[in-house]
């Protein structure tokens, strides 16, 4: 079955509406939607997001869901529950602390420093089919680190799914180089006059259209 990008990345209406109506553009790269997505969580919306991501992931026949703490856990858990799959999340440690596990160092924008992602190798069985789920795809550092650990464990990344994607950052291009199919429920193409534009969704900015 050939999967078309439109199915994988078409806007999810309940989410797109909330972003357009309530999203706060902080600067040319930061969109705050923490009052319903990743700080205070609208559980009804998150449940719907989980069902939608699980539906789009279904053709890839994933055997487990992988994410990183902390903001990746809510959408990953909602997806895992909807898909009836186990969930594994990478824990964050001080980079100077040795951890007997699969590890990668990444820069954390929220903490503004290096952190160490760690996963117990026994939770990523060799040969398993893994789907990465996270709240945002921006620079792609977290997703790439998770993918590297999956490959080190001898498993396969079958897809990477995100609630929100910032198209104007390099995350998608980096993941595409690995050949990983990408799912996103809202692709932010740019910010205009302090408002986000979502690909394939009617704009609230006069005279502007994206897709």
Curated annotation (Swiss-Prot):
GO terms for molecular function: xanthine phosphoribosyltransferase activity. Xanthine binds at residues 31, 38, 166. Its EC number is 2.4.2.22. It is found in: Cytoplasm. Keywords: Cytoplasm, Glycosyltransferase, Purine salvage, Transferase. InterPro entries: PRibTrfase_dom, PRTase-like, Pur/Pyrimidine_PRTase, Xanthine_PRibTrfase. Pathway: Purine metabolism; XMP biosynthesis via salvage pathway; XMP from xanthine: step 1/1. One of its GO terms (biological process) is xanthine metabolic process. It catalyses: XMP + diphosphate = xanthine + 5-phospho-alpha-D-ribose 1-diphosphate. Gene3D superfamilies: 3.40.50.2020. Its main location: cytoplasm. One of its GO terms (cellular component) is cytoplasm. Converts the preformed base xanthine, a product of nucleic acid breakdown, to xanthosine 5'-monophosphate (XMP), so it can be reused for RNA or DNA synthesis. NCBIfam families: XPRTase. Belongs to the purine/pyrimidine phosphoribosyltransferase family. Xpt subfamily. This is Xanthine phosphoribosyltransferase. It comes from Chloroflexus aurantiacus (strain ATCC 29366 / DSM 635 / J-10-fl). The lineage of its organism: Bacteria, Bacillati, Chloroflexota, Chloroflexia, Chloroflexales. The gene is xpt.
